[in-house]
């Protein structure tokens, strides 16, 4: 059987077809796993439909609320490639749905849910049979009837909500829960399960998802800073230190904290990778002296870089790609919702097996000459610099701020972001976040009267900090955010980037430039609508874009 998936930037796009629709997607996901993820999403939509009904009776099931976004997160790009675990999530979704349904019926014997996913049952234990069942839920199954524009808007909402679900799970791990957010999530998820076909309603839904995600990012920020302190500027070594070692990748700061606690005094050093880099800025994480540095570059280079790393690797969230290519599948471990067939999975927070493996390996034989980069410009630090920024602008020392961030990826066109960063004039500042920073974060940019010209605000979810800074600057200057000498140049790859974009648009931020390509699910008509409403456009050339943005 074949798949249909168009959720990430590397999806197949030719004049003849749009989306991965073969035995395997460009990310390495098999048709089986992709189809079973469609089945899981349908089961989760049915679960959300009953969660909405339950709230009408005052029933709030926290097991349902915590499980639903977490399981949805498993379908995000480069997270879980393990078909049996995907089916396990679907079975758990149905079991939770039936329990919730029973709670509703106990209150009202006539309780019913009008949703096509509300009574979904898996037809078999056989993966092949389940894959055939999943064909009923392929996202483009009614494309001929509804057209490409409606399909594209459905997918914009589905993928945006998927990105928000990932942030909800990150926040939940840190003890953050907001009933209003979960109620809104279930309402949207259930509605998408009805296969809506009204263009205006779908556009409104996409903005609702963006607004909801702003609240999600707020509680995630509260969770991270509440547990680990507010990030402050910190130098991080990106070269090797002699000794045994573990590499930890992803976004989960709690996993990193637990690993640091458990490795303390063992002689094993810990390195961050990818989106874990901003962890070095948090006081409660950097206090561990054996958190010695950051290793590697963008996630797309992991098959080469992980093969060279002389210790075990822990993946806490996206992004994982085929570890058999570099033959390190025997020393990569997955956590939480991450999965790869044949790779060892850590069900809990006990890293002793990983530590034991690290102690058996050689580690780095010598320390390299340090190369230090600076991270840790969190929300509090950024707000503390607001008056300095305004003063520099008023004295014409600072002409413009570029928010240059987002996802990294493998396309050669992404060199645009390196070229853009190095072309930014000396009287302008670069604010960056997410893994797109690896395109330029080891370059030297100097400063403006002591203020670094490259300011690393953190992970992708730390777009929240950048938004708060922009709002604060606008308030202090008595203008709107769109009137600031501020331009957003964003790179996208997967669904977290999609929901960040929806968040910005829902807040009224205009004239965002994105690349390296437009999402495959957005038709020319939809791109025209977004351009007309928000001024959203794709990158062109560095020279043209720089000229236009500086003169805006």
From Swiss-Prot:
Q: Does the keyword GTP-binding apply?
A: no
| Protein EC | 1.7.99.1
Compartmental location? Cytoplasm
Keywords attached to this Swiss-Prot or TrEMBL record, sorted alphabetically, are:
2Fe-2S, Cytoplasm, Iron, Iron-sulfur, Metal-binding, Oxidoreductase
Record-level Gene Ontology MF annotations:
2 iron, 2 sulfur cluster binding; hydroxylamine reductase activity; metal ion binding; peroxidase activity
- Indicate which residues the UniProt annotation says bind hybrid [4Fe-2O-2S] cluster: 251, 275, 319, 407, 435, 460, 494, 496
Determine if Protease is one of this entry's keywords.
no
What does the UniProt record say this protein does? Answer: Catalyzes the reduction of hydroxylamine to form NH(3) and H(2)O.
Name it.
Answer: Hydroxylamine reductase
Q: What is the lineage of its organism?
A: Bacteria, Pseudomonadati, Pseudomonadota, Gammaproteobacteria, Enterobacterales
